[in-house]
């Protein structure tokens, strides 16, 4: 299963773009983009939006990958990770139904 970093790298390479070219459009150092692609650093939400535009990726799908990576990395080492996800899903449904904002 590809991470958001792998998705970005695969798409960038398929378009024949260099790290420095994409990094320049993002206004970040190419070393940072390289770390994002290698999953050594997490992109910001703003980076995800810009990357989707630069690489012509579906913004919503890339955002789903970004958010799911964040959650997965946060709870992966927990013994109760699956239970946490099930309860979190119920909480999200509740919050959406009751229009609760954080």
What are these regions (language model features)?
Residues 1-14:
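A short, Lys/Arg-rich alpha-helix, primarily the initiator
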Residues 27, 44-61:
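DNA major-groove recognition helix of helix-turn-helix/homeodomain DNA-binding modules
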Residues 63-102:
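Short, charged recognition helix plus adjacent turn
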Residues 8, 19, 30, 45-48:
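Helix-turn-helix DNA-binding elements, focusing on the entry/boundary residues of the two helices
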Residues 16-34:
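Short alpha-helical DNA-recognition segment
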